[in-house]
Regions:
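A generic "structured core" feature
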Residues: 2-7, 65, 82, 109-113, ...
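Conserved PLP-binding active-site segment of the aspartate aminotransferase-like
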Residues: 55, 132-138, 155-191, 195-196
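Residue-level detector of anion-binding/catalytic polar loops
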Residues: 5, 153-154
């Protein structure tokens, strides 16, 4: 149907640790059918809360006409600072520094989860700032979350992100994020999780 659009939410795509970066679908869109969404919450600072949208040319008029009724909750000063940060080339340098920091945290976490081999399978480790832990020992998501909580560690069950019911193979899956922790805390937390899981 020619009147339909694809919405591409390119969250965390800046952080890829293995292989070449995966190009955005929007970059291949010769027909103007992809609406591209992104955010600076991981790459710059969560507190800024600035997102962006790249619209196909044919939707720009509609946005100008109807999008005016939405007011931005982001201060004009923050928007101008980000604009200048981007236009002066600081963002790319900052992103390279953040990639190195997150890659180092990522590597520390994976190294300290080695003892879980056979207990679980890890996925999502090639990009982003979190991993999925798929338990193969019969542990449920609820049990894994509870055991982590007892250790003072917050992990999330995959079911909290699902639109519908999870398939049976996904019911023992948790999300383990590492963006906000330093390497030492990551190592300590991973060792404690390995003991209880």
């Amino acid at each position: 149907d020619a009147s339909r659009y694809i919405i591409e939410d390119d969250y965390d795509s800046e952080f890829r640790y293995k292989g070449k970066p995966i190009p955005a679908l929007q970059g291949f869109d010769a027909g103007g059918k992809v609406i591209y969404l992104g955010t600076f919450s991981r790459s710059i600072a969560p507190s800024i809360r600035i997102s962006y949208m790249v619209l196909p040319d044919q939707l720009m008029g509609v946005y100008r006409d109807k999008g005016q009724i939405f007011s931005s909750t982001v201060s004009r000063v923050d928007q101008l600072i980000i604009s200048r940060f981007l236009s002066e080339g600081h963002y790319e340098r900052h992103l390279n520094r953040m990639r190195a920091i997150y890659k180092s945290r990522h590597d520390v976490l994976l190294a300290h989860l080695q003892s879980l081999e056979g207990v679980c399978r890890i996925s999502g480790e090639n990009a982003g700032v979190h991993l999925l832990i798929h338990f193969q020992n019969g542990m449920t998501e609820l049990r894994a979350v509870e055991l982590a909580k007892r250790e003072g560690i917050k992990v999330y069950g995959l079911s909290g992100c699902a639109i519908g019911p999870l398939r049976q193979v996904e019911t023992g899956t948790v999300i383990l994020g590492y963006a906000t922790l330093g390497e030492e805390k990551i190592a300590q937390a991973a060792e404690r999780l390995c003991r209880v899981w």
